[in-house]
C-alpha cells in the first residue's frame, strides 16, 4: 500500500495557478507522484515474484468524482487524479505477472490532522458538526483500513485490477463497517447532498 503525500500544508485553496506558490505546488506534486513511483520501482520486483500480489495506491476521490469536480487547486487536483492513473498504468504492467493494482480513496477521513483542524478529538468528533454539518458523513481511518485488508485477502481481487475504488463502495462489496457499525458512503453523499446544496443529513448514506 502506497499512501505517501504530506503536502497538505502546501495547498493554497481557490488560488489560481499563476498566483499559487510554484515552489510549493511543484513540491506537492513530487510528494504525491514521485514518491509513489519510487516506491513502486523498488517494491514491484519483489511483488511480482509471486502471483496474487496487490498494489493499493491511496488517493483522494474516486475517478468518477474527480472527473466531474475540480479539487479547488490545480496542483492538488493533478496530484490526486494522477495517482488514479498511476494505479491504472501499473495494472497493465502487473497483469502479465498475475498481480494487480488499484486506486483506493477513503471518504471524508477523520484523520488526526482533520480532527485538529476542527479542534476536536475522535471521542467528541460530532462537536465539529456545529462548524461543518456535512462532517456527519466522515469516517475513521480504520474504515479504509478494513477495505485494504479485505482486498488483500480476496483471492479474486484481480477483478478490480486498474479500477478506482472507495471505502464506502468496498464496504458494501465485502460487508464490513466502520467502528460505529455504519457504512459511510461519502462520495455519493458529496454529490447528492453537499454539492447539491441540500441540508446536511447523512441518513441513508451511512
Where are these regions (language model features)?
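Catalytic loop of short-chain dehydrogenase/reductase
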Residues: 4-7, 16-22, 51-96, 107-109, ...
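Active-site Tyr-X3-Lys motif and surrounding loop/helix of classical short-chain dehydrogenase/reductase
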Residues: 12-31
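Amphipathic alpha-helical dimer-interface segment in Rossmann-like NAD(P)H-dependent oxidoreductases
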Residues: 27-51, 63, 91-92, 96
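Conserved catalytic Lys-bearing alpha helix of Rossmann-like short-chain dehydrogenase/reductases
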Residues: 33-36, 78-87, 101, 144
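Rossmann-like NAD(H)/NADP(H) cofactor-binding core
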Residues: 56, 97-102, 163
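Active-site/pore-lining binding-face segments in mid-to-C-terminal subdomains
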Residues: 101, 105-109, 114-116, 146-150
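C-terminal helical subdomain
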Residues: 103, 123-206
Amino acid at each position: 500500500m502506497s499512501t505517501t503525500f504530506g503536502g497538505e500544508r502546501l495547498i493554497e485553496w481557490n488560488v489560481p495557478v499563476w498566483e499559487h506558490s510554484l515552489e510549493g505546488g511543484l513540491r506537492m506534486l513530487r510528494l504525491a507522484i514521485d514518491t509513489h513511483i519510487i516506491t513502486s520501482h523498488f517494491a514491484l520486483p519483489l511483488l511480482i515474484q509471486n502471483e496474487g500480489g496487490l498494489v493499493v495506491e491511496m488517493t483522494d476521490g474516486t475517478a468518477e468524482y474527480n472527473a466531474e469536480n475540480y479539487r479547488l487547486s490545480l496542483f492538488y487536483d493533478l496530484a490526486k487524479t494522477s495517482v488514479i492513473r498511476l494505479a491504472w498504468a501499473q495494472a497493465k504492467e502487473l497483469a502479465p505477472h498475475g498481480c494487480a493494482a488499484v486506486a483506493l480513496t477513503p471518504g471524508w477521513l477523520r484523520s488526526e490532522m482533520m480532527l485538529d483542524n476542527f479542534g476536536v478529538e475522535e471521542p467528541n468528533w460530532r462537536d465539529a458538526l456545529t462548524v461543518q454539518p456535512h462532517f456527519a458523513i466522515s469516517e475513521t481511518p480504520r474504515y479504509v483500513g478494513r477495505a485494504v485488508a479485505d482486498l488483500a485477502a480476496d483471492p479474486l481481487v484481480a477483478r478490480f485490477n486498474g479500477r478506482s475504488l472507495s471505502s464506502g463502495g468496498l464496504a458494501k462489496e465485502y460487508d464490513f463497517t466502520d467502528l460505529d457499525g455504519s457504512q459511510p458512503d461519502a462520495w455519493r453523499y458529496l454529490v447528492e447532498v453537499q454539492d447539491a446544496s441540500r441540508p446536511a443529513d447523512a441518513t441513508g448514506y451511512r
